[in-house]
Structure formats: structure tokens, C-alpha cells
Amino acid sequence: MKNAVVYIHGKGGSADEALYYKKFFNDDYEVLGFDYKSELPWQAGEEFQNYFDSLIPNYNEILLIANSIGAYFSMLSLSEKPIKKALFISPIVDMKNIILHIKIISPRFFSSP
């Protein structure tokens, strides 16, 4: 059984962008582009999970490359899926909120002098 690399584009992108990444992987990996239709996070959740559920039985391991809003939707939707590695390119996230919740920096960091 092969391994899969799934590319998820950003808004206005296309699954065809996955072709760029083929040169980075040997024949043990099938590079797939996921052309999702969702525009809102709660729509993406179901669509992304269903797509990955259809892939999981067919591959030994799945790697993920996701861009922009596709990366954001992936983080929200796929945290429980068996993805071996993920590369997020320019994900749209609320970094201030993330930093505050993991408590690595004091809230004073965000205040004006």
C-alpha cells in the first residue's frame, strides 16, 4: 500500500497546485489535491473529515500540506485524524489567542508601553 501526501489549497486556489509538490516525493507517495467547496469553518469540518475518512483505509500513512485558509480549516477539522506529519503554509490563525492559551508569554506582552 502506498502513502499519500494531501495538498489543501487556500481560497481561490485549486487542487491542481498539488502537482508542484510531486517533485519532493518518491514513488512511494501519491500526491493528491483536495478541491474543497466549503467557505466557512463549520462547513469545512464535515467536508474535510469525510474526505480524509475515504483516504485512510487506502494508505499506510498520510502527510498533509495545507495553505492559508485551507491550513486553518485543516487544523480545525483534522486534529483527530491519523496524519503523520503536517506542513501549514501561512495559516490564518489568531496568534494572540493561541499564545495566551498556552501560557508561554505574559499578557503584558500585548500591552502598549
List the predicted regions and their residue ranges.
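Short, glycine/serine-rich, charged loops/turns that create anion-binding
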Residues: 11-12, 69, 93
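The alpha/beta-hydrolase serine catalytic core
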Residues: 83-113
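Short glycine-/acidic-enriched loop or helix-start segments at secondary-structure transitions
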Residues: 16-18, 73-76, 97-98
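Gly/Ala-rich beta-loop-alpha elbow adjacent to hydrolase catalytic centers
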Residues: 65-74
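Short, surface-exposed "cap/lid" segments of acyl-processing enzymes
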Residues: 1-39
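Alpha/beta-hydrolase active-site loop
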Residues: 17, 38-57
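Aromatic pocket-lining residues of Rossmann-like dinucleotide-binding sites
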Residues: 77-81
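Short coil/turn segments at beta-strand junctions that form active-site/ligand-binding loops
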Residues: 2-3, 59-62, 84
